[in-house]
Amino acid sequence: MAHTVLQPFKRINLPVLNAYNNLFCNTFLVQTRSYAKKPVFKGKGKGMVKEVLKGPEVCKDPAKLCTYAVGVNVFKQGEDPTIKPKDEYPEWLFQLNLGPVKQLNELEPDSWEYWRRIRKEHIWRHNKLNKGKKM
């Protein structure tokens, strides 16, 4: 039974004297790895350059940029949503901080943003200290 179980793993044909020898030899064989194929380049020569991928086209039409939210539609079909007047959007949308992140001394000590920033800075410091240590 051991011979039939180990038969698919046999890589080298060795002379076999008995079943014990067959079992003993098959357990110490090294398995081979089959790596993925290297990419094949089109054309001749060693220094061929891979094909450069192109990004999405950028819309430069000013009329369309002023009336539609270009690039917001993530579906293949359909078109971009139209831009509505300001009074149709909620007020909190215009109060969002889109600039650089506030520093720790600019935040109020009792806000959750302050404590979240403290936790982040502690994690950054901890990671920086443990960067050079080996396990």
Curated annotation (Swiss-Prot):
Molecular function per GO: structural constituent of ribosome
Subcellular location: Mitochondrion
Keywords assigned by UniProt, alphabetized: Mitochondrion, Ribonucleoprotein, Ribosomal protein, Transit peptide
InterPro entries membership: Ribosomal_mL54
Family: Belongs to the mitochondrion-specific ribosomal protein mL54 family.
Record's subunit section: Component of the mitochondrial ribosome large subunit (39S) which comprises a 16S rRNA and about 50 distinct proteins.
Protein name as annotated: Large ribosomal subunit protein mL54
Gene source species: Danio rerio
Gene: mrpl54
